[in-house]
Amino acid sequence: MANYFIDRPVFAWVLAIIMMLAGGLAIMNLPVAQYPQIAPPTITVSATYPGADAQTVEDSVTQVIEQNMNGLDGLMYMSSTSDAAGNASITLTFETGTSPDIAQVQVQNKLQLAMPSLPEAVQQQGISVDKSSSNILMVAAFISDNGSLNQYDIADYVASNIKDPLSRTAGVGSVQLFGSEYAMRIWLDPQKLNKYNLVPSDVISQIKVQNNQISGGQLGGMPQAADQQLNASIIVQTRLQTPEEFGKILLKVQQDGSQVLLRDVARVELGAEDYSTVARYNGKPAAGIAIKLAAGANALDTSRAVKEELNRLSAYFPASLKTVYPYDTTPFIEISIQEVFKTLVEAIILVFLVMYLFLQNFRATIIPTIAVPVVILGTFAILSAVGFTINTLTMFGMVLAIGLLVDDAIVVVENVERVIAEDKLPPKEATHKSMGQIQRALVGIAVVLSAVFMPMAFMSGATGEIYRQFSITLISSMLLSVFVAMSLTPALCATILKAAPEGGHKPNALFARFNTLFEKSTQHYTDSTRSLLRCTGRYMVVYLLICAGMAVLFLRTPTSFLPEEDQGVFMTTAQLPSGATMVNTTKVLQQVTDYYLTKEKDNVQSVFTVGGFGFSGQGQNNGLAFISLKPWSERVGEENSVTAIIQRAMIALSSINKAVVFPFNLPAVAELGTASGFDMELLDNGNLGHEKLTQARNELLSLAAQSPNQVTGVRPNGLEDTPMFKVNVNAAKAEAMGVALSDINQTISTAFGSSYVNDFLNQGRVKKVYVQAGTPFRMLPDNINQWYVRNASGTMAPLSAYSSTEWTYGSPRLERYNGIPSMEILGEAAAGKSTGDAMKFMADLVAKLPAGVGYSWTGLSYQEALSSNQAPALYAISLVVVFLALAALYESWSIPFSVMLVVPLGVVGALLATDLRGLSNDVYFQVGLLTTIGLSAKNAILIVEFAVEMMQKEGKTPIEAIIEAARMRLRPILMTSLAFILGVLPLVISHGAGSGAQNAVGTGVMGGMFAATVLAIYFVPVFFVVVEHLFARFKKA
């Protein structure tokens, strides 16, 4: 093939230009993302049972739905929560690659089977089935810059005018409002109700009747008389709109003819629909909207669309209302991608300088340099064809590919230059001869490297998706690189290179010194190799010791899934003791805000707090803070990284009295959890009950706290059992007094919970009407005795006459995992430990708990456990495939052994570099290790290929052939290896956005390549001679 293009250079250029054009078009159309769809798709089923406690919700709603979720294609695991607000949420997580649309349809079909078994009140409320991500993409906060709007004014405007347009924006899966729109609040007074012989149900029924939209029909409607001349709509009654109108609702007419109006027994006002959350931005009243991605949506496109929509809506905002973004994960995505692009450019420049140093000829250097954009753009075209995105993983693949793809072109150019100099041939003839010598080596390298990366494409789960991104990117680059090296590169060599002048090229002083030093080094290397081959047994023992060291390093290197990143934002949770009020929670959140805005003012840009809300559940004792940091360029230095800020905050905020305040970083992949570290589900496999499971959980937390050198921040991601005030109704006594149980339940539910009645109109928007006891009549236990229920004879009977009360404990939030009662445990690895170490330690602690208590990993930890199980198989398959590819290529079983024996030399270097830098054996390291395996084999192939050719064509002995081959290939091996090492150097020294991943990829590859080069050039001749002698003896035998 090469000879064809040497004679047709224009054709080679045409193909290269077509590849670049295709790549250019692909880049303009490829979407940009931090990661591909790594996270498995999730479907969430949400239901509400008004007035029910957590246990009732679990028994009558959650379990009923769970038990029908069988036979779903690709379901991995299922988690659910039931809380004291009557909410049930079941999240079903499916295998990566499952269509969210199909999964949603299947879940909806299964839900229909459960519907008849659900309480009627639940069915009336409706059940939603959503396919949005469970994690927050961004938070938009709204503030009044001059204080003219209070938090309820702001929240009502946001709910009425902003929430719905945002929820319809492309890419938005769901929105969560931190605040509430206005509602008509009817605050009942039990004493006045009793005075007029009324109960809450009387109020509710009259509101329903008198606040109603009646369809009155028409005058002159069809069919009509032949001479009908009039047609008009009849308006009978419309919905009420103001507190004054509601206050005039007639409840009853007394015997003396006087009227009892709603305002006589209740206070009527325009209040919030929901008082459960309090939002603040830098301590000022605010409202906020959390945006969650739709399944499969692009984060950058969605964020851009949301901001454009808010910018459009801002033209209609009240004068003082402003939008701020206290939490946004997309700047990190944009900047990290930009950093990798920058790394790509730096790598190309460094590779060019290395090539120029070795080739010392601008014409020769420009040839492999031209190959870089051709192959990279061609790779983008392939990525577009297979449906990939421009993301961190594909860009890392490109950076790794630069060092690999120039290798082929360097091998071609260097050998053509050597033939021109040694054989005194003109460039075209020299190129023909050179390609005949190295064509098989090029094919061999391509086959080996492709064989290394091919098994990665068939791994499963989130890890498999990461591997696939690297695999397709690198294999595409390799194949295109070989194609360019056998088409464009020889064509360029034949047309650009010049014949060697008489006496050879005269290098400048710098190159002359370099050449002198290199020639001495080459001679020393040749002499050393000859010495090594006299005592191969001794060096095979050294090799075995190196392999043993590799095994030790493998065992001691900590494991993890993905490295943590400084994403420019993080969160802080606050949990107060059970029973704490919103007032106390708000004070704690203000202390958190003050700390970040004063003590960390050089690093923190804003703090947005939400009282009453947290990932562990909703409650007055829960709070969450979103902290936005200043740009990375303003936070230079490790002491200003998110990790350092969190460590300082953890110490400082631990001093807050009567609250557990915990700052935490975001996970590497947002959809795989809410916090970094590990995520464990403690399971009640033995059906021990909630109390025993709580005891086991507390024992586990106590054991973990005793080992701060292993794990830290181990905490339950749930709500503690809280005091509950139980009302025991004596049904027999109530029946004897003529009081219906339904009336008792209605009165208690309305007074101490609330009752949604119907809707009213406010500023052209339909809003809700709620009836509830006034604040003074539902604050204390004794308030229960102030309420009366009318009996069958029409007299008022106090609740205290047929009920008793007591204090008890119960959970405000119950959890289940795969249909088993569970409790979620979150935590972090201690300093110097990896998440893999922490997970193993926690598993050992669970083994010490009572029988019947088990565990399972979920979220990011589930994927980490899956990836650690797949890694050994991945390495083994890759090595086997490489061996078979080499055997097929050389039609020999012995030569592949000579090549494969070099692999541990590169692996030990990768492990040593990773260990010395304190990094872990994560997915990026595993990809780097496979790259190292391929590159180690490549260097061996370059030497072995020439040695085999000399043995076959020139009849040399194995020792003579390998010494000469090693001498001839030393320069291209060192050149290509140094080019690769410097190509990944920008990854190794990277800092700022995305540096965690870059360091993880670059460190192992750089260490591995360095070791593979330094050790392999000495050990490959040893391996070749030993294997040849062993196989020669085997044949004789």
From Swiss-Prot:
It comes from the Bacteria. Residues 29-339, 386-391, 461-473, 556-870, 917-922, 992-1004 are periplasmic. This is Multidrug resistance protein MdtF. Pfam families: ACR_tran. Homotrimer. Part of the tripartite efflux system MdtEF-TolC, which is composed of an inner membrane transporter, MdtF, a membrane fusion protein, MdtE, and an outer membrane component, TolC. The complex forms a large protein conduit and can translocate molecules across both the inner and outer membranes. The keyword Transport applies. The gene is mdtF. InterPro entries: AcrB_DN_DC_subdom, Acrflvin-R, MdtF-like. Belongs to the resistance-nodulation-cell division (RND) (TC 2.A.6) family. Part of the tripartite efflux system MdtEF-TolC, which confers resistance to compounds such as rhodamine 6G, erythromycin, doxorubicin, ethidium bromide, TPP, SDS, deoxycholate, crystal violet and benzalkonium. Keywords: Antibiotic resistance, Cell inner membrane, Cell membrane, Membrane, Transmembrane, Transmembrane helix, Transport. GO terms for cellular component: membrane; plasma membrane. The keyword Transmembrane helix applies. It is a multi-pass membrane protein. Induction: Induced by EvgA, probably via YdeO. The chain crosses the membrane at residues 10-28, 340-359, 366-385, 392-413, 442-460, 474-496, 537-555, 871-890, 897-916, 923-944, 973-991, 1005-1027. Residues 1-9, 360-365, 414-441, 497-536, 891-896, 945-972, 1028-1037 are cytoplasmic. GO terms for biological process: bile acid and bile salt transport; response to antibiotic; response to toxic substance; xenobiotic transmembrane transport; xenobiotic transport. It is found in: Cell inner membrane. GO terms for molecular function: bile acid transmembrane transporter activity; efflux transmembrane transporter activity; identical protein binding; xenobiotic transmembrane transporter activity.
